[in-house]
Amino acid sequence: MTNVFKGRHFLAEKDFTRAELEWLIDFSAHLKDLKKRNIPHRYLEGKNIALLFEKTSTRTRAAFTVASIDLGAHPEYLGANDIQLGKKESTEDTAKVLGRMFDGIEFRGFSQKMVEELAEFSGVPVWNGLTDAWHPTQMLADYLTVKENFGKLEGLTLVYCGDGRNNVANSLLVTGAILGVNVHIFSPKELFPEEEVVALAEGFAKESGARVLITDNADEAVKGADVLYTDVWVSMGEEDKFAERVALLKPYQVNMELVKKAENENLIFLHCLPAFHDTNTVYGKDVAEKFGVEEMEVTDEVFRSKYARHFDQAENRMHTIKAVMAATLGDPFVPRV
């Protein structure tokens, strides 16, 4: 059976065409519908999936696990203490071993080079569950959520608020540009995206007709926005920068004042989670005590408002990850896109 995705890796959004990403988003919606109606879709019957987690996760682990089981596969979780990537065994050797035992490999960790080496040497499809550079599975969930709310993607405006050089900002910028979505990064100059990432996005935007804007001006960034999106102020491994980030990013918090600047009652709010919108966590209490900040990247008011779609977005991680796994490892009929 013909399948143009068969055997391919999912490492970064830039490796896929607009038509391919749109197909994966639509296939995700189809699989979501099948699950809601309890219709089996076991594209990976009898397959074994390795889930490599150098970085911990709630949503990514849960999504890959449930998606694997729904597809008829067996997922095996290997955490940071279970794998020796680059420590006692090279990534190349680990990849060659796992590729002989598993049919597909998910990796969530720090280095993009590491996930690329797994892909190069394993001989099986490898899926990027997050690296410091890119977060491609998150993007499919994000843009599926946007499409569910607006019925389209092209011509919409998504504004990312906060740390403009993290993996989520990179991926939103490039994926949006590919899909014809206008992406604005609203960030302090010190945290603007890398020039290389902006140049890549601008190249795709030229083809799709999208607009790329990098600014520290709230009015310029947010007016006319369809989507406001934010992420944590400090990424994993950067905890020592907390005081600096709180001071730098407080003006970029998503609050009702910022929402009103968009002048769009149909606006939606997205967050890839976890979110620090109150003090109901150990982390939140600690930050409140040390820095006097009870709400960080988003206020509790916005987080619980009619605009919020982040729990739909979190659920969509499972459906979109399922689509990627089924398309690259299974046998759906996809002669062309």
UniProtKB/Swiss-Prot annotation:
Q: Name one GO biological process term.
A: arginine catabolic process to ornithine
- Family matches, as Gene3D superfamilies: Aspartate/ornithine carbamoyltransferase
**Keyword Cytoplasm carried by entry:** yes
Annotated residues that bind L-ornithine are located at: 167, 231, 235-236
Identify the SUPFAM superfamilies for this entry: Aspartate/ornithine carbamoyltransferase
This protein's pathway? Amino-acid degradation; L-arginine degradation via ADI pathway; carbamoyl phosphate from L-arginine: step 2/2
What this protein catalyses is: carbamoyl phosphate + L-ornithine = L-citrulline + phosphate + H(+)
Report the GO terms under cellular component: cytoplasm
Q: Where in the cell is it found?
A: Cytoplasm
Chief localization: cytoplasm
What is the E.C. number?
2.1.3.3
Check the record and name the InterPro entries matching this protein: Asp/Orn_carbamoyltranf_P-bd, Asp/Orn_carbamoylTrfase, Asp/Orn_carbamoylTrfase_sf, Asp_carbamoyltransf_Asp/Orn-bd, Orn/put_carbamltrans, OTCase_ArgI
Q: Which UniProt keywords apply?
A: Arginine metabolism, Cytoplasm, Transferase
Keyword Oxidoreductase assigned = no
Recorded GO molecular functions are: amino acid binding; ornithine carbamoyltransferase activity
Where carbamoyl phosphate binds, per the record, is at 57-60, 84, 108, 135-138, 272-273, 317
Which HAMAP family does UniProt cross-reference here?
OTCase (MF_01109)
Q: What does it do?
A: Reversibly catalyzes the transfer of the carbamoyl group from carbamoyl phosphate (CP) to the N(epsilon) atom of ornithine (ORN) to produce L-citrulline.
What protein family does this chain belong to?
A: Belongs to the aspartate/ornithine carbamoyltransferase superfamily. OTCase family.
NCBIfam families from the xrefs? orni_carb_tr, PRK00779.1
Listed name of the protein: Ornithine carbamoyltransferase
Organism of origin? Streptococcus suis (strain 05ZYH33)
